[in-house]
Amino acid sequence: MQTKTLFSRHYLEHHLPDHPQWDEDPRPAFDAVRELWQKARRHGDTWNEAQTEQEFIQPVLDLLGWSYVVQPEAHRGGRVTRPDYALFPDDETRDAAYPHQGDDEAFYSRARAIGEAKYWGRPLSQKHASGRETWKPGNPSHQMVSYLVGTRVAWGILTNGLIWRLYSREVSSTASEFYEVDLGLIFDFLPQGGAPTAAQLDQFRRWWLFFRRASFAPDPQGKSFVQRVHEGSATYAREISDKLKELVYEEVMPEIAGGFVAYRYHELGV
């Protein structure tokens, strides 16, 4: 699991289990994805993008409960301007969106998220040798920024099959702030034909909970699971920052000041 500031790592480790969704059983989904994974590991390196989608990504989206529309590519100035997938909460909402294809505002306003797929294992962030990302159309992270801005959808999922990233349109640095899970770190270390350990199932749960359709559905208060985790994480980070400031002013600064006074008295005689 990796997070680049979209969610606080400490919050995920210590407070995510406090959410009621944590108690849901991920094992049926785990077993289904594991079967798909075994095939992908045998053949994925030979797949192109369309094959990766057909053989792995679309079956996984189905298991996650999504209804979706695969978008025909739309080009403007040599750039692709639409994401691969519009992700809907159910078939009824998806079917209601079909007549609005071509009217992006009406179409995407019905979507809960957008999805962008790449061929198996394709790097999701292209970088200079210096390690800094470059802004160009071929960079998947920056494509996701463009799609989120263009469609005005709140959430985006980017994946190459192996790695899954969740992006939010509401953060300040959309391209570099994401929640990432590497499925290889879960499924490549399972005992051959055996049951997963509790720790491995927990790691899978941290993927399943953030990418399934149900986690983007509003609760009776109008907020989804991913919204609540994002808000809880931000609140937690602010509280930690405030506590650190209090510690500096109440404990650290007096000690520094006391040390300075003692130095002047003993060393300078003032």
Language model features by range: what are they?
Residues 1-40, 96-113, 117-270:
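Short, basic/polar, glycine-containing "phosphate-handling" surface segments that engage DNA
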Residues 41-78:
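Acidic-basic catalytic patches of nuclease active cores, encompassing PD-(D/E)XK
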Residues 46-54, 79, 109, 134, ...:
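Generic alpha-helical scaffold signal
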Residues 60-62, 91, 119-121:
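Short glycine-rich, polar/acidic loop-and-turn segments at beta strand-coil junctions
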Residues 69-74, 92-100:
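Gly/Pro-rich turn-and-neighbor structural signature
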Residues 76-81, 158:
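A short catalytic or substrate-binding loop motif that flags glycine-/basic-rich loops and adjacent residues
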Residues 79-92:
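Charged, often glycine-rich, active-site loop that binds/positions anionic groups
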